[in-house]
Amino acid sequence: MALFDWHKHFDPVLSYLNETGNTRWTTALKEQLTRRFEDNPHGDMERWHNALQSLPDVADARVDLNRSAITLTSPSGLDPDAMTRLENGLRGLMPWRKGPFDFFGTYIDTEWRSDWKWDRVAPHLADLAGRTILDVGCGSGYHCWRMAGAGARQVIGIDPGLLFMFQFLAVKGYLGQAPVDLLPVRMEDLPADMECFDTTFSMGVLYHRRSPLDHLLELKGTLRRGGELVLETLVVDGPEGYSLMPEDRYGQMRNVWFLPSCPTLLRWLDRTGFRNARVVDVSETTTDEQRQTDWMRFNSLADFLDPDNPSKTIEGYPGPKRATLIAEKP
């Protein structure tokens, strides 16, 4: 199999960034991508690339971005050999954590029902039509596709996980020049104060950051004046000022630092310069929303909860509850 040609996949978004005046990001991004794919490639990258390359060509692929599953169809259909190659290639990109997706009748039942989160968030958003959007910690890009389905002009997702990137490319490979891109970089890799996005999403990221206030300031720096922040994170019950810092792990995750109360989150947003911050949803995460499937065969939420009291994590902390907040940059 040929080596992964990152220029083929990322030159269009680099050109877009140049054309929209983001030359600082373009310069840094070229260096980051060179290091990622040429100087220090991931040990599994060849395997994932081979799986991507093995997917069958479908000349008449169509997509519906507004269903619960991102759905690819073909009016002419796929023959049995192509369907076998399709499933084998997609299984070569396991585990699939964020979705679901439907590739020409092959349904990928992902670990997370990411459509449930979208259904909770979407009614509260400013109209996404014509907006330029950044999705921080986007996983395999499920929500990026839903944003495009809502009419976004350009969506850029960032997530350092290379497997997520290959899963994203499995979808994009059938869509041609869709205005959605996924960059395998971290939030910290972005230039400060770009101020170029109309909406920035950060969902499932804040609790992984040692300094949550710095993360909020970084997010604010991505937004133009009047831009909208959509923040979703783990929370706990408690008064303003209260935040849980786990002793070690939370739900078996090592990299969880702060689980604030909703009043504390509102104060953080106020102190970091956002306006009109409000809580639009609070939902407990259940084993119906996050679970082991045939496409993600490792441990999942049920294994991270106390078997005698599933309202608590296995470490004895309150079970996962997620809040979505929306705020604007003045």
Swiss-Prot record:
Species the sequence originates in: Marinobacter nauticus (strain ATCC 700491 / DSM 11845 / VT8)
Role, per record: Catalyzes carboxymethyl transfer from carboxy-S-adenosyl-L-methionine (Cx-SAM) to 5-hydroxyuridine (ho5U) to form 5-carboxymethoxyuridine (cmo5U) at position 34 in tRNAs.
GO molecular function: methyltransferase activity; transferase activity, transferring alkyl or aryl (other than methyl) groups
Protein's name in the database: tRNA U34 carboxymethyltransferase
Region of interest (Disordered), residue spans: 309-330
Annotated GO biological process: tRNA wobble uridine modification
Matches recorded under Gene3D superfamilies: Vaccinia Virus protein VP39
Catalytic activity field: carboxy-S-adenosyl-L-methionine + 5-hydroxyuridine(34) in tRNA = 5-carboxymethoxyuridine(34) in tRNA + S-adenosyl-L-homocysteine + H(+)
Cysteine pairs bridged by disulfides in the record: none
Similarity annotation: Belongs to the class I-like SAM-binding methyltransferase superfamily. CmoB family.
Keyword tags: Transferase, tRNA processing
Pfam families, sorted: Methyltransf_9
InterPro entries (alphabetical): CmoB, Mo5U34_MeTrfas-like, SAM-dependent_MTases_sf
Transmembrane regions listed in the UniProt entry: none
Subunit structure: Homotetramer.
EC numbers on record: 2.5.1.-
